[in-house]
Design a protein with these regions (language model features):
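Hydrophobic face of amphipathic alpha-helices that form TPR/SEL1-like repeat modules
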Residues: 41-48, 74-83, 87, 97, ...
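Structural signature of tandem alpha-helical TPR/SEL1-like repeats
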Residues: 52-59, 88-100, 124-136, 160-172, ...
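Terminal, low-structured helical/coil segments at or just beyond the last alpha-helical repeat
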Residues: 268, 279-316
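Hydrophobic membrane-insertion alpha-helices, especially the h-region
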Residues: 10-22
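N-terminal leader/linker segments that initiate helical-solenoid repeat arrays
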Residues: 22-60, 72, 76, 309, ...
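Positively charged n-region of N-terminal signal peptides that target proteins for export
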Residues: 1-5
Length: 316
């Protein structure tokens, strides 16, 4: 290659890249211009979303999501596809929109991708991909991403199991007011994972989370009262916490409260209430609730004398 060709190449490649960037920016501005007053459109979309007018909000977000820099709109539209708000649920479209938003730096989208890849929702489980996105969101101080990343370390998913690192991440998230993190700190103190064992400290964190209406923490408070950890055994108090968690839609709480109504423990015996709670839990995929519901429908009396509970602590 002669000197002239070298000079042309050295100028041409950066110039080509610059033209590409300018071209993309120009295309983005042209698209935004065709939408009219973008700010007004965004305010309208947000307002419709807050009013739960999901179908109309979804249409506006779909227009706005076409702007490359509109990561917030891409995230919200993705979440609407994920939740099935304003139309059909579509996990694949949700994931693609989350990727767009996450690449634009949206921490909520990065966190959601971490969750999707951890749980394998609409795609294969991929802990390494989950770790990548959760780390990016956690670096932006996203509390729920810290919880998700902590859970990868707690379980050894895609990383070496490290309870101390998990505890550190939960503590950081709890400092931001995250109630899942508070509950998880209580769980770690209960069993001495990554920290010292202390029922007193466990109760401190779980109660703090329960006061803020975290359903898992409310459920865990029920386990302490029913099993007699940190308190004298008290089925009535346990039932109160289970009622609160069940009302917030936690399947494990619905099932165990149903068993209490079926057996008349901590509450007045009531088969109709037991059946109602079993149906709620079963609809969310709780297998034991489904089994007991089938026994009730078959009028199988053996289930009434069966003392099965599922009072195990839950962590997120």
């Amino acid at each position: 290659m002669n000197k002239k060709q070298t000079i042309i190449l050295s100028i041409g490649i950066p110039l080509f890249l610059l033209l590409g960037i300018v071209g993309m920016k120009f295309h983005n501005e042209i698209y935004a211009w065709t939408l009219g007053d973008v700010k007004s459109l965004y305010v309208q979309a947000e307002s419709l979303y807050q009013q739960k007018e999901y179908e109309e909000a979804r249409k506006l977000y779909a227009k706005l999501a076409g702007i490359d820099s509109a990561s917030r709109c891409q995230y919200v539209l993705g979440d609407m596809y994920f939740q099935g708000q304003g139309g059909e649920r579509d996990y694949e479209k949700a994931r693609k929109l989350f990727i767009q938003a996450a690449e634009g730096g949206n921490a909520d989208a990065q966190n959601n991708l971490g969750y999707i890849y951890t749980m394998g929702i609409g795609t294969d489980t991929d802990f390494h991909e989950a770790k990548k996105w959760l780390r990016m969101a956690a670096a932006q101080s996203h509390p729920q991403a810290m919880v998700g990343l902590g859970s990868l370390y707690r379980n050894g998913w895609g990383v070496l199991k490290d309870h101390k690192e998990a505890f550190k991440l939960y503590r950081r998230a709890a400092a931001h007011g995250n109630t899942d993190a508070m509950n998880n700190l209580g769980y770690m103190h209960t069993f001495g994972y990554g920290t010292y064992t202390s029922i007193r400290d466990a109760l401190y964190y779980i109660q703090k989370s329960a006061v803020l209406n975290n359903p898992v923490a409310l459920y865990n408070m029920a386990t302490f009262h029913i099993e007699g950890h940190g308190f004298p055994k008290n089925m009535e108090k346990g039932a109160e916490y289970l009622k609160a968690a069940a009302q917030l839609g936690l399947p494990a709480a619905q099932f165990n409260l149903g068993r209490m109504y079926q057996l008349g423990k901590g509450v007045e015996q009531n088969d109709q209430e037991a059946e109602r709670l079993f149906r709620q839990a079963s609809a969310q995929g709780h297998q034991l609730a489904t089994d007991f519901l089938m026994k009730m429908e078959a009028k199988d009396s053996t289930s009434v004398n069966d003392s099965i509970f599922e009072m195990k602590m839950i962590v997120r």
